[in-house]
Amino acid sequence: MARYIGPKLKLSRREGTDLQLKSGVKPYDVKTKKAGRVPGQHGNTRNKASEYSLQLREKQKVKRMYGVLERQFANYYKESARARGATGEHLLQMLERRLDNVVYRMGFGSTRAEARQLVSHRAVMIKKAGRDEFVRVNIPSIQVQDGDVIAIHEKAKEQLRIKNAIELATQRGIPEWLEVDHSKMQGTFKQAPDRIDLPAEITESLIVELYSK
């Protein structure tokens, strides 16, 4: 399955919530007056959804929010199911640990897609916990571990899009599980977020029910 490259706002409208696929310069409800309307000719026509369709819709929503493809998502679920504790919470934590997501959460990318591009273009470095040196990486799916330090490479620090993203991030706020110094363009992943710190609009139990069939 190829990565979606069409209009991002249409995806958010389809899911009925802001998937944070746009920069956030304008609020979601301001960018479109159709915020509560599903795209298409019959967007206002809503049939009663089946249990399966609700579960599938929730999976699609989370995949699109984090920019993850089907096979990747299924692998994340399998690994989460093997871990102790709540499978759904482990799944969300794995998605939050993705390097592209961490770069976005730290405020170096205005969207996850932009953060993914920064990583792919080798503009991001990582220093593993206990190590002394940073290493340039280009794999967005790297799982960031507690104590890892993420930094923008020296050659990329003057990029206007990074500076704009930082400005947006100061308005949005930085999650408590991260420690970021925007003046140095680096930050530390302190620990995995608790469920209460993660997006409230996600109902991960529906995803667990879907994969449990």
Curated annotation (Swiss-Prot):
Assembly mode: Part of the 30S ribosomal subunit. Contacts protein S5. The interaction surface between S4 and S5 is involved in control of translational fidelity.
Keyword Ribosomal protein carried by entry: yes
Keyword Iron attached: no
InterPro entries: Ribosomal_uS4, Ribosomal_uS4_bac-type, Ribosomal_uS4_CS, Ribosomal_uS4_N, S4_RNA-bd, S4_RNA-bd_sf
Protein name: Small ribosomal subunit protein uS4
Function: One of the primary rRNA binding proteins, it binds directly to 16S rRNA where it nucleates assembly of the body of the 30S subunit.
Keywords tagged on the record: Ribonucleoprotein, Ribosomal protein, RNA-binding, rRNA-binding
UniProt similarity note: Belongs to the universal ribosomal protein uS4 family.
Gene: rpsD
Cellular component aspect of the GO annotation: small ribosomal subunit
Pfam families membership: Ribosomal_S4, S4
SMART domains noted in UniProt: Ribosomal_S4, S4
Origin species: Psychrobacter sp. (strain PRwf-1)
S4 RNA-binding domain span: 97-165
GO biological process: ribosomal small subunit biogenesis; translation
Lineage: Bacteria, Pseudomonadati, Pseudomonadota, Gammaproteobacteria, Moraxellales
GO MF annotation list: rRNA binding; structural constituent of ribosome
